[in-house]
A protein has these predicted regions:
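N-terminal Rossmann-like dinucleotide-binding module
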Residues: 1-51, 405-407
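Short, Asp-centered acidic motifs that coordinate Mg2+ and/or phosphate
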Residues: 33, 71, 151
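Short acidic low-complexity segments
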Residues: 55-65
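Short loop/edge segments at beta-strand edges and connector loops
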Residues: 58, 97, 124, 213-216, ...
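Beta-strand-loop-alpha-helix segment that lines the small-molecule cofactor/substrate pocket
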Residues: 66, 71, 77-78, 82-129, ...
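Predominantly a Rossmann-like dinucleotide-binding segment in NAD(P)-dependent oxidoreductases
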Residues: 128-212, 218-221
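Contiguous beta-strand/loop segments that form the cofactor/metal-binding neighborhood of enzyme cores
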Residues: 182, 188-313, 324-332, 341-411
Length: 411
């Protein structure tokens, strides 16, 4: 049984603890060690884990020095992903890091260099990539039966209120200390659904990003953005559109529509199900046999890699890099974040009961974007502003110019 050592047991890391305990019951992996920087804060959980045979350490360095783990997990805040993953890889460990791997393309490439130098690998926890449904869709596209992927689009409306933004020091922020986090719906909460499209289009010749055009907006009292439209054009000519917002009261679960030369794909996140329709009238359906297990699948597949049963993580740094590049170029294209004026905003309530900033008409805009493939400015939203595409070729460092650095509050 593969032994995990993870950094943290509170916040989002508490989910990893639960998922690993489920995998332990199934005989696939177990939580052998955990880093808990503030054991007094998590006293009950530390006691419970110790009773289960999990060793608890005050620092990652102490856990790495003691050994006894096969994979190091990093379910921490965005700013800590790269330094902690690099520390573990330098010590000889393979790593699974939570998504996104980083906020900037230079950090991803630094970590890729660590992987090359150490011979270790770093998997990234984009959960749907590890699911049988997305893998099945990737196989269908790679087979050529659908022809070239022409267009893909996804729209997501996930209400997020004051409690969401108060849950940690970097939620809704551009930076944590001196490190960029660029938090926002496309960067973090709905990142999976941008990554899914980038992962699927990578089966095509010319699947690399050619340019990005984006509109980033802020309605709430945060530093970063809470609504976004991101258009990605690939070198092969495919157009991908990701539209998302936290500024609404009605939940719109992710739906992805894909148009190909010889058919189409309809995918829904709620039950991780897909329908493939071919131009000749054939239809195939795939439902996830256990959609509730989607969150634990990265941990399970990485354990199989560590055990020598699978050749490589389904989502490594190479697969996760395009998402980070798309986010960085989105900020470059938008030139910062546009504020939605108070005349278009109202107060609402999130599902957790906390106060929420609501943009009037956002639900309808998201539905229109999914149906038409148009961006907020193209749909005539009164607060929206059009932007220009930015080329990906040669881009290697965020922010790419001083004007953007100033717009985001410093270099």
């Amino acid at each position: 049984v593969i032994r995990y050592g993870i950094v943290g047991v509170g916040g989002f890391a508490a989910n990893w603890v639960r998922w690993l305990e489920g995998l332990e019951a199934a005989g696939q992996a177990r939580l052998a060690a955990a880093v808990v920087r503030d054991p007094a804060k998590h006293a009950a959980e530390v006691e419970r884990l110790a009773a289960r045979g999990c060793r608890v350490y005050p620092t990652l360095a102490a856990m790495l020095a003691d050994g006894g783990v096969d994979v190091v997990g990093v379910p921490t805040g965005i700013a800590q992903h790269v330094p902690l993953a690099a520390q573990a890889m330098e010590a000889g460990y393979n790593v699974l890091v939570e998504k996104p791997v980083a906020a900037t393309i230079q950090e991803v490439r630094e970590l890729q260099e660590v992987a090359r130098r150490t011979g270790r690998w770093c998997a990234v926890g984009f959960q749907f990539i590890y699911s049988p449904t997305i893998q099945w869709l990737r196989e269908r596209l790679a087979s050529g039966q659908l022809g070239a992927l022409l267009r893909a689009r996804v729209a997501i409306g996930w209400p997020r209120g004051a409690r969401y933004y108060a849950r940690n020091p970097w939620a809704g922020q551009l930076r944590q200390g001196d490190t960029w986090v660029l938090d926002g719906p496309a960067t973090n909460a709905t990142a999976h659904h941008l990554e899914n499209m980038l992962y699927l289009v990578a089966t095509q010749g010319g699947g690399a990003i050619a340019s990005v055009r984006a509109e980033l907006y802020r309605a709430g009292p945060i530093a970063s953005y809470d609504s976004s439209c991101i258009e990605v054009l690939t070198e092969g000519g495919a157009r991908l559109l990701h539209v998302a917002s936290h500024t609404l009261e009605e939940t719109l679960e992710p739906v992805m529509e894909v148009e190909c030369e010889r058919g189409s794909i309809h995918w829904e996140a709620a039950d991780n199900s897909a329908i493939v329709r071919y131009a000749d009238g054939r239809e195939e359906r795939r439902a996830d046999p256990d959609p509730d297990e989607v969150h634990a699948r990265p941990l399970a597949q990485v354990a199989r890699v560590a055990a020598g049963l699978d050749p490589a993580p389904l989502c490594g740094l190479g697969e996760a890099e395009p998402h980070v590049l798309a986010i960085d170029l989105a900020f470059e294209s938008s030139g910062g974040i546009a504020t939605i004026g108070p005349e278009h905003v109202a107060q609402g309530t999130a599902g957790d009961g906390s106060a929420l900033v609501r943009v009037e008409g956002m639900e309808g805009l998201l539905r229109q974007a999914l149906a038409s493939g148009r961006m907020f400015s193209e749909l005539g939203a009164p607060w929206a502003r059009a932007t220009r595409p930015v080329a990906a070729r040669g881009y290697g460092r965020f922010p790419g110019n001083e004007a953007l650095a100033r717009a985001l509050g410093g270099v």
